[in-house]
Amino acid sequence: MTRHPEYQYLDLMSELLETGDRRMDRTGEGTLSLFGKQMRFKLSDGTIPIFTTKKVYWKTSVKEMLWFLTGQTNISSLLRENVRIWTDWPLAKYRKATGETISQEQFEDRIVASDEFASEWGDLGPVYGKQWRRWVDNDGQEHDQIATVISTLKTNPTSRRILFHAWNVGELDRMALHPCHMTYQFHVSWPNGQDGRPQLSMMVHQRSCDIFLGAPFNICQQAVLLAMIAQQVDMDRGELVWLGGDTHLYLNHLDQARLQLSRKPKPFPKLEIKRRPASIDGYTIDDFEVSEYQSHERIEAPVAV
């Protein structure tokens, strides 16, 4: 019997608990860390790796991916979609700059209510979406990396240069958070021969990974991105390959990790994209249907900022 693919994740978390290198980190929380890990997930059977040993809010994950694809960098549009995962960084900046002891809810309400306030305090700098869709080179010219990937997949699918990334050295200092999942590379194969349907796979290099909170969220949205691009270029879904650089478990997540390790995975759900928009920019959250998702209860844990 084939071992459930979620055990790759659980085994990695167990390895971190047993042999992870204890170290202090940028956030001051401290971590157990391992370097250079890999997980592989097959999407060709229609499933999607939404982990089941705790509840993953897949719609929030996909909404963030759709936001990346718009090229936007302000949290205001995310908040209007009830997505609050980026608020911590601009909120911390606001509190430090003003000395105001404002609550997260009050801050978010002001961002949504006032375009002027959102413009001043809600922008994250040139983070993921800006680099994906409007990378600026030395002469000031903008490049749409996503459009280039899709065009190359259609015209030169065997190229070894089909990738995009977000590590723009010249703009790192202006980002609220440096890119964690930074490089996405694509590979086309013909498993049934050159006369058969092409299959699209994607490899993601994540230089830094919060394995408890971040990985389940990122892997879900990366699988959805692969499915979207495969649909846009008329290819079948292949494999998602995930590579972790500094793969870590925060010291204030250890009890939560042990609880999750006590649970057995359930079957992965199915992902259906209900229509094919004219371009990658045409997708909305209503286009995605996840069926047969059964999970254990959610496990809460604090975010390290």
From Swiss-Prot:
Q: Which Pfam family is one of this chain's hits?
A: Thymidylat_synt
Major subcellular site: cytoplasm
Q: Which residues bind (6R)-5,10-methylene-5,6,7,8-tetrahydrofolate?
A: D210, A304
Q: Name one GO biological process term.
A: methylation
EC? 2.1.1.45
The UniProt function text for this chain reads: Catalyzes the reductive methylation of 2'-deoxyuridine-5'-monophosphate (dUMP) to 2'-deoxythymidine-5'-monophosphate (dTMP) while utilizing 5,10-methylenetetrahydrofolate (mTHF) as the methyl donor and reductant in the reaction, yielding dihydrofolate (DHF) as a by-product. This enzymatic reaction provides an intracellular de novo source of dTMP, an essential precursor for DNA biosynthesis.
- According to its UniProt record, which reaction does this protein catalyse? dUMP + (6R)-5,10-methylene-5,6,7,8-tetrahydrofolate = 7,8-dihydrofolate + dTMP
Q: Give the pathway annotation.
A: Pyrimidine metabolism; dTTP biosynthesis
Q: What is this protein called?
A: Thymidylate synthase
Per the UniProt entry, what species is this protein from, by scientific name? Answer: Sinorhizobium fredii (strain NBRC 101917 / NGR234)
Query: Superkingdom of this entry's organism?
Result: Bacteria
